[in-house]
Amino acid sequence: MPKYRSATTTHGRNMAGARALWRATGMTDADFGKPIIAVVNSFTQFVPGHVHLRDLGKLVAEQIEAAGGVAKEFNTIAVDDGIAMGHGGMLYSLPSRELIADSVEYMVNAHCADAMVCISNCDKITPGMLMASLRLNIPVIFVSGGPMEAGKTKLSDQIIKLDLVDAMIQGADPKVSDSQSDQVERSACPTCGSCSGMFTANSMNCLTEALGLSQPGNGSLLATHADRKQLFLNAGKRIVELTKRYYEQNDESALPRNIASKAAFENAMTLDIAMGGSTNTVLHLLAAAQEAEIDFTMSDIDKLSRKVPQLCKVAPSTQKYHMEDVHRAGGVIGILGELDRAGLLNRDVKNVLGLTLPQTLEQYDVMLTQDDAVKNMFRAGPAGIRTTQAFSQDCRWDSLDDDRANGCIRSLEHAYSKDGGLAVLYGNFAENGCIVKTAGVDDSILKFTGPAKVYESQDDAVEAILGGKVVAGDVVVIRYEGPKGGPGMQEMLYPTSFLKSMGLGKVCALITDGRFSGGTSGLSIGHVSPEAASGGSIGLIEDGDLIAIDIPNRGIQLQVSDAELAARREAQEARGDKAWTPKNRERQVSFALRAYASLATSADKGAVRDKSKLGG
């Protein structure tokens, strides 16, 4: 029978000092036999996805205390990728994932907490907390802040839905008037919550649901809706039950590594492919799998991508649907239901509620459930009122979207595409693979060949795109922007957005060893591995080289002979200490980022730290 970890600091005469300090936090004698549960919050006023979380930790804590636990809250950092985008701030985004994971480990282990409730929401916060949860392997429940309502505005006598990416594109489009650009900017992000499309934050919150570590509805129920409060209340109660099951009944099924098993990781990736999620989820799932000591690799993702269809299409791949529409159609469970009926899921998995997949679908799939309360929850909709307050409205759709032929979520028979929303490509400069979000690629350019225009920084590429130096048919290559080379593996949302602004979104490709925002669409291929800074062949590409992209056949090829590539590699190695570094880039890199770069692996390993360099 495992002993409460917290007993280390609450029991025994030699822990009198620790108990004295616990008493100073408000604990009493009666508390010293109870489980201490960390409420891991990420409130910050910097990030719209987190600005409403200040009081939600207290909400969870009250339920923990009422159920017989002791709640202790702390905060992690949270970087807003959208605000950090397009300047040096983006160098810090991905490294912040490791800092978040480490800080959770530090706090929980230093104070011997028994379990956690993780209150996350945005791009690197959910993955960082997920990595920490699987590393620590103590009972955990995730409950995120929820998606933002979609922006809406009237243009050309039509009400259209908007999001952050629209503001970026229109702001850079010389054909758009100042007044229209201003109108879109003011309308794009109307409420608190994670950006309204199937971008990285919402993708990851959907995946925690598929992994079984959060409750049904977590990935899609709006931040502003009153129904979301129940998820927080339930999380506080349920974590005490899970904690007691493990420590008092020796039930290891309550542990995250037994919930988020390899079968669950496969289900999560299947969901990701079916819903056309962000390519960043590949990075984060690979990283989380390593923390869980699960053998889940790019090869597994490649196999799944070849058999899973696209059953859901959401912004940025279409402006018709946002997360509020996914929720109306049944949310994550609605997509999982269609995948299950198609025979594409592992059914022998459980979630934090203790339900198997068939039980979860029976109770929460809008196509199966007889529970009116569940149907009512999935009718929770937007209010269209600007606010930064959680749970501030209770508007509902008149009906559910259960049209599996033409609605937001489709059945296998009516799939948007028999090919899934993500694909892994391999070739002679991506020997370990690269990732493309096929959900956002126009059918006309699934096969594409063009001459390379090579840039060694995102900034130079943006300048060239806006300066008219990139033309139809070009393949823009941005290298030395990987985890080590950037360092920090910047997102390339501005280059892809500006290609659209310049009318090149369907006639150009962009390839990088960096990554893309979840808001990216178009022929945008990232995570090229090995990266240039690690000696990857992307560092050998020269202006004018032809590059052939073949998504249907999962290929990407630099049309240069092996002999020529060998000669280029020899010349590169002859640069000595300067080999595999940018030739014409000046970038100030802090000590903190250099420390990150010294241990970073390429994207095919999840951009995690290389444990072999630490002797582990």
UniProtKB/Swiss-Prot annotation:
Binds 1 [2Fe-2S] cluster per subunit. This cluster acts as a Lewis acid cofactor. The keyword Iron-sulfur applies. The active site is at S517. It is an enzyme of class 4 (lyase). Gene3D superfamilies: IlvD/EDD C-terminal domain-like (3.50.30.80). It comes from the Bacteria. It catalyses: (2R)-2,3-dihydroxy-3-methylbutanoate = 3-methyl-2-oxobutanoate + H2O; (2R,3R)-2,3-dihydroxy-3-methylpentanoate = (S)-3-methyl-2-oxopentanoate + H2O. Keywords: 2Fe-2S, Amino-acid biosynthesis, Branched-chain amino acid biosynthesis, Iron, Iron-sulfur, Lyase, Magnesium, Metal-binding. Belongs to the IlvD/Edd family. Homodimer. This is Dihydroxy-acid dehydratase. It comes from Escherichia coli O17:K52:H18 (strain UMN026 / ExPEC). The gene is ilvD.
